[in-house]
């Protein structure tokens, strides 16, 4: 199989889309070794892209009051951008959406050596929250750790911590990542992680 084969291109309704997919794969990942890997990585990339948008919109509650993505499912067997295929199987985006659309969610945004750790509470009650923020290296050693206790008001989002980690990261930017463990008052936990460089 080949993404540029006549059969694959007949399913692609945007003439420049396959090139864009390959471009963004090359910006973020190493090039996949075969067609199956290419399909898989393109689905992971789709999930990461949609997550980035949703996280941004949730962090800007008040300016943006909701988000939907196109499209949920397929009505016939086809190669598509749907998050659930015709047979009801979840693709990477749908697994990711179940987490990033959770009523109580956390997210990390990185730029350079800076990280913004945020939380959203879409419930109708204020929620107390503990967030343990760590900078880890690829061997999982903890280089930095801080726990923040806060409350996220009902139907709101907050920045829990904003910090430039240049002093922690030093010259190891490609070998470290930010991690945030969110523990809500009802015991619900989730972990978010984000690198400071593209995944490749």
For each feature predicted by the language model, list its residue ranges.
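Hydrophobic beta-strand positions in extracellular immunoglobulin-like domains
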Residues: 119-121, 135, 182
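Intrinsically disordered, low-complexity Pro/Gly/Ser/Thr-rich segments with frequent PxxP/GP/PP motifs
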Residues: 131-174
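Acidic-enriched, low-complexity/disordered segments with a strong bias for Aspartate over Glutamate
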Residues: 34-36, 55, 74, 85, ...
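Substrate-binding clefts and catalytic carboxylate motifs of secreted carbohydrate-active enzymes
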Residues: 1-127
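Generic structural motif
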Residues: 106-108, 131-133, 178
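Residue-level signal for secondary-structure boundary sites
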Residues: 125, 141, 186-188
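Terminal connector regions
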Residues: 129, 159, 164-200
